Design a protein with these regions (language model features):
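Conserved long alpha-helical elements within nucleotide-processing catalytic cores of c-di-GMP signaling
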Residues: 2-3
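Conserved subregion of the PPM/PP2C metallophosphatase catalytic domain
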Residues: 6-180
């Protein structure tokens, strides 16, 4: 599904010229539903979660839309969580709603994070529980002033310490961007 998603993003953004993140996700959903024959019975029951950002460095603005994934923005030690919509790109049971577009004003040294659910869903610790979103956000707040290289090391160390003897259950992707 990821390869299909990458191909669709290129087609929608480059070939069709769609610029708004909410419209891009809407077009992706339509094309995935069509290509997997999801509008009819017997089609593949597959979808994709995604965070999509469009960063305008000159205007210091980020546009964000998400399908089951969020954007975390940390500015001056204040964390803002911009939630993605509770719907995938692809098969949707129930009402098909447009995706939401968030526009976030940025300042120098702000941090942006997009991430999969793998880090926070990982089992570990003394009681074998999930890491959870609140703990993940606290970790990002603790480390956001560090260089991005150091943040990577700290996230990896925390994950390794948390999982200890537990097997990794999902892919883990955390992407951080410092605004300069």
């Amino acid at each position: 599904m990821s390869m299909n998603g990458t191909s669709l993003l290129n087609e929608i953004i480059i070939d069709k010229g769609v610029k708004d993140t909410d419209k891009i996700l809407g077009e992706m959903r339509s094309q995935i539903i069509k290509s997997l024959h999801q509008e009819e019975d017997g089609g593949q029951k597959d979808g994709m979660d995604i965070s999509l950002c469009k960063l305008n460095i000159k205007k210091k603005l980020v546009e964000f839309s998400g399908a089951h994934n969020s954007l975390i923005h940390i500015s001056e030690d204040e964390l803002n969580n911009y939630r993605g919509d509770h719907q995938p790109v692809g098969l949707l049971l129930g009402d098909k709603k447009p995706f939401t577009k968030h526009e976030v004003k940025l300042k120098k040294n702000d941090m942006l994070y997009i991430y999969s659910d793998g880090y926070q869903d990982q089992f570990g610790g003394e009681k074998g529980k999930k890491y959870m979103g609140a703990k993940f956000k606290k970790q990002l707040l603790r480390i956001n002033k560090e260089s991005t290289d150091k943040q990577l090391i700290l996230l990896e160390e925390e994950f390794k310490s948390w999982t200890h003897n537990y097997e990794q259950i999902d892919d883990v992707c955390v992407m951080g961007v410092r605004i300069t």
